[in-house]
Amino acid sequence: MPMRPLVIVPDPILREISKPVEYIDSAVQKLADDMLETMYHAQGVGLAAIQIGIPLRMLVLDVSRNDEQKNPLVIINPEVLWLSDERNIYKEGCLSIPEYFAEVERPKRLCVRYQNREGKQTEIEADDLLATCLQHEIDHLNGRLFIDYLSKIKRDMVIRKFKKRAKEKNTQEAVL
């Protein structure tokens, strides 16, 4: 299971809307395994396929703690059925926006219908951290990032910072 390179802001692919997975076959199974390996290696709790440059409606999650047994979820073609009115605030980060964290307010609970890695239609009701992670990753599938919930000033500052990093990286690579 090879790890896949992560797509980093300001890459425009992160703003694309992902397409549904048509068939769950061995290629999709392998993609799920690669995504999980990539997520665990990067020490993340979630990863959407678009974050490795694949615009498919697919994500992986594991909110278990380091001292707990792994409990990975593979979620294909998710559809949010309902969101609670009650809200939570969590400090969020993103593998596509490394080393940046900000508080984001989201619904505390939700219900999602999806296909699991075997293609079986499933529903999950989640709250707190799992609900937040599901919403964060589903946002990726719709071309939305957690920084979109911040003020325009903060969001623009983050994007400028990452554009500058990308420019410096490209300059260094050109020198080598």
Curated annotation (Swiss-Prot):
Catalytic activity: N-terminal N-formyl-L-methionyl-[peptide] + H2O = N-terminal L-methionyl-[peptide] + formate
Residues annotated as binding Fe cation: 94, 136, 140
Pfam families, per the entry: Pep_deformylase
CDD domains: Pep_deformylase
Cofactors, names only: Fe(2+)
Any one GO molecular-function label of the UniProt entry: metal ion binding
GO biological process: co-translational protein modification; translation
Protein name from the UniProt record: Peptide deformylase
UniProt source species: Bartonella henselae (strain ATCC 49882 / DSM 28221 / CCUG 30454 / Houston 1)
Gene that encodes it: def
